[in-house]
Amino acid sequence: MAIAPITGTLKRKIITDISIGFACGFALATGYWYIEHKPLIVKREAYYAKLKAQQEAEDSA
């Protein structure tokens, strides 16, 4: 009884590596977006809203 040759392992490894890479990249990008980026945008928008309100108060006075 002969042992069957191992075929397709390189292709399977490449597909697995690419899939894991995309999954990890997507997870890290999503984490960055919601943990780091969104709070910075909220803080910046609040600052500019406050600045605009101050300028409007000075212009109307």
From Swiss-Prot:
Domain of life, per lineage: Eukaryota
Organism: Debaryomyces hansenii (strain ATCC 36239 / CBS 767 / BCRC 21394 / JCM 1990 / NBRC 0083 / IGC 2968)
Phylogenetic placement of the source organism: Eukaryota, Fungi, Dikarya, Ascomycota, Saccharomycotina
Any single GO BP term: mitochondrial electron transport, cytochrome c to oxygen
GO molecular function, one term: cytochrome-c oxidase activity
Record pathway: Energy metabolism; oxidative phosphorylation
Subcellular location: Mitochondrion inner membrane
Family: Belongs to the fungal cytochrome c oxidase subunit 7a family.
Residues that make up the propeptide removed upon maturation: 57-61
Any one of the GO CC terms: respiratory chain complex IV
CDD domains referenced in this protein's UniProt entry, alphabetically: CcO_VIIa_fungal
Protein name: Cytochrome c oxidase subunit 9, mitochondrial
Stated role: Component of the cytochrome c oxidase, the last enzyme in the mitochondrial electron transport chain which drives oxidative phosphorylation. The respiratory chain contains 3 multisubunit complexes succinate dehydrogenase (complex II, CII), ubiquinol-cytochrome c oxidoreductase (cytochrome b-c1 complex, complex III, CIII) and cytochrome c oxidase (complex IV, CIV), that cooperate to transfer electrons derived from NADH and succinate to molecular oxygen, creating an electrochemical gradient over the inner membrane that drives transmembrane transport and the ATP synthase.
TM region(s), chain numbering: 14-36
Keywords attached to this entry: Membrane, Mitochondrion, Mitochondrion inner membrane, Oxidoreductase, Transmembrane, Transmembrane helix
Mitochondrial matrix side: 1-13
Segments on the Mitochondrial intermembrane face: 37-56
Entry membrane topology: Single-pass membrane protein
